[in-house]
From Swiss-Prot:
One of its GO terms (biological process) is translation. PROSITE patterns: RIBOSOMAL_L14. It comes from Gemmatimonas aurantiaca (strain DSM 14586 / JCM 11422 / NBRC 100505 / T-27). SUPFAM superfamilies: Ribosomal protein L14. This is Large ribosomal subunit protein uL14. It comes from the Bacteria. One of its GO terms (cellular component) is cytosolic large ribosomal subunit. Coiled coil: none annotated. The lineage of its organism: Bacteria, Pseudomonadati, Gemmatimonadota, Gemmatimonadia, Gemmatimonadales. Gene3D superfamilies: Ribosomal protein L14.
Length: 122
């Protein structure tokens, strides 16, 4: 569960390292974001030669959460960290690589480019 003011890791090579969630997209009263949900983030830590800079505002999709997520078969999936991938307005990643595993829920939410770039899908 990711909410406003959550600090998340950026799991791609866009240049950002840490980001602050400033809005959960999907309705005016939406409080929490889970796997595959879109958020708006402000970059807090960035590499000097990356495509995104510190204090940039960007859209992102949640790829890992510490809070467990229940699947239809009754199993649960959870990760060691909260992580996002920065995307453009079309839902495609700005980066060319993705670090760490991503959840299978991204395939169900039609983020095929992120799933194909990921080294592992759990």
């Amino acid at each position: 569960m990711i909410q406003q003011e959550s600090v998340v890791k950026v799991a791609d090579n866009s240049g950002a390292k840490r980001a602050l969630v400033i809005r959960v997209l999907g309705g005016t009263r939406r409080r929490y974001a889970g796997l595959g949900d879109r958020v708006i983030v402000a970059v807090k830590d960035a590499l000097p030669n990356g495509t995104v800079k510190k204090s940039d505002v960007a859209k992102a999709v949640v790829v890992r959460t510490v809070k467990e997520t229940r699947r239809k078969d009754g199993s649960y999936i959870r990760f060691d960290e909260n992580a996002v991938v920065i995307i453009n307005d079309n839902g495609e990643p700005k980066a060319t690589r993705i670090f760490g595993p991503v959840a299978r829920e991204l395939r169900e939410k039609r983020y095929m480019k992120i799933v194909s770039l990921a080294p592992e899908v759990l």
